[in-house]
């Protein structure tokens, strides 16, 4: 293994595993080694103690994504001990900084050390292959095949500063507030990508509910708490998240700013930007704070077949389905190198577990039985892909 330090205390760990057929394109198997902070006072356990309770491992990173990192390491440790060679070359990549925009992790590696990934055409990583129980107990395994893009923008309204006791028809804060309220209340049109259509057809088939391509929203209730995340993938979105204006109660500020978290579907970035502009009008400026691409790849081919076959070999009643993720992963950075990525970190979950709420949540935890299932499925996949 080799360590690539992009900045002080920002390390990326890369290892190469030679396959039995080195003429085949390589596979990147990657995870991130950072986690978001945790306020210990909010937790029922020490968030960094990895306590085992009620058949689960509790702690920050248990689902995002130390669980996957641990599965990967368990598999390659077994290979090292037995001398096993996978069918193709594998690049193991453990990135820094995924939770902070990937700047010193996958983005830095792709920009500064693309040679690390030379010969690789495909990748797998987090947030995919987890089970969602629907209908009369059928399990759908959600494999990530698409991701929304990001456009964080700062809106600024300028006006006439003055004394708070005076009338002011050029109040920047008033203008900004009206614009922010319009954005927050805007009803974005439903737009369904190919990945979303495939997913909802599978949901309809598994539950026996009608499939109406004109309005997929009625099917959301069939997937329980997962609907919160999947519902966000049926349209673009823009949420006001921060406000900044003024410095004293009796001073009308000359400017006021707000931050908007915009998310766009694959192929619909222009629509997001044009809609925001039309909502707020011409007098408020827009500054890009951060932008990242959207992704969508085909849910077909040998790699997808290998993922699906690995799932059904270990859960014959399981139904692999593609889904569009409302957030993003390090696969976005690797896509800039032409690498096609999927979210495949299999977990068989209890039907009543609100899995999505655990990401960055209080009392984050992962079922040990899910990990045991996942490591077997992941090993099966890696040994047959």
Question: Model-predicted segments: where are they?
Answer:
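Active-site metal-coordination/substrate-binding segment of hydrolases
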Residues: 23-91
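Acidic, glycine-rich active-site loops and adjacent beta-strand->loop/helix elements
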Residues: 33-35, 94-102, 126-131, 161, ...
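Short, conserved micro-motifs enriched in small and acidic residues
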Residues: 57-70, 99, 170, 365-372
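Active-site-proximal alpha-helical scaffold in enzymes
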Residues: 68-83, 103-111, 172-175, 182
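Beta-strand segments within the central parallel beta-sheet cores of soluble alpha/beta enzyme folds
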Residues: 87-95, 121-125, 195, 323
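A glycine-rich helix N-cap at a beta->alpha junction
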Residues: 111-129
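Metal-dependent amide/peptide-bond hydrolase catalytic core
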Residues: 129-379, 383
């Amino acid at each position: 293994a080799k360590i690539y330090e992009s900045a002080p205390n920002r390390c990326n760990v890369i290892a190469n595993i030679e396959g039995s057929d080195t003429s085949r394109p390589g596979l990147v198997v990657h995870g991130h080694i950072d986690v978001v902070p945790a306020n210990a006072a909010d937790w029922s356990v020490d968030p960094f103690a990895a306590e085992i309770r009620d058949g689960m491992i509790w702690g920050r990173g248990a689902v995002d994504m130390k669980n996957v990192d641990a599965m990967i390491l368990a598999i390659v440790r077994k290979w090292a001990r037995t001398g096993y060679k996978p069918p193709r070359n594998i690049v193991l990549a453990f990135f820094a900084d995924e939770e902070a925009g990937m700047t010193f992790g996958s983005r830095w590696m792709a920009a500064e050390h693309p040679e690390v990934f030379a010969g690789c055409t495909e990748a797998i990583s987090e947030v995919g292959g987890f089970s969602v129980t629907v209908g009369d107990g059928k399990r759908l395994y959600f494999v990530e095949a698409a991701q929304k893009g990001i456009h964080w923008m700062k809106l600024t309204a300028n006006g006439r500063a003055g004394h708070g006791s005076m009338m002011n028809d050029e109040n920047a804060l008033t203008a900004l507030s009206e614009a922010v309220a319009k954005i927050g209340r805007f009803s974005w049109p439903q737009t369904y990508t190919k990945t979303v259509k495939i997913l909802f057809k599978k949901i309809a088939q598994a539950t026996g509910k009608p499939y109406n391509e004109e309005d997929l929203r009625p099917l959301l209730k069939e997937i329980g708490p997962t609907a919160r995340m999947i519902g966000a993938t049926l349209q673009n979105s823009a949420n006001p998240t921060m406000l900044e204006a003024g410095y004293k109660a009796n001073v009308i500020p000359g400017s006021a700013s707000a931050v908007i978290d915009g998310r766009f579907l694959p192929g619909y970035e222009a629509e997001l930007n044009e809609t925001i502009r039309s909502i707020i009008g011409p007098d408020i400026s827009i500054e890009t704070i951060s932008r990242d691409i959207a992704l969508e790849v085909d849910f077909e081919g040998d790699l997808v077949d290998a993922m699906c076959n690995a799932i059904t070999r270990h859960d014959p009643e399981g139904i692999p389905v593609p889904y569009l993720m409302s957030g993003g992963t390090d696969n976005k950075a690797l896509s800039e190198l032409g690498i096609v990525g999927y979210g495949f970190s299999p977990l068989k979950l209890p039907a009543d577990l609100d899995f999505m709420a655990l990401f960055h949540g209080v009392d984050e935890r992962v079922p040990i039985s899910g990990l045991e299932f996942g490591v077997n499925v992941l090993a099966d996949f890696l040994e047959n892909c």
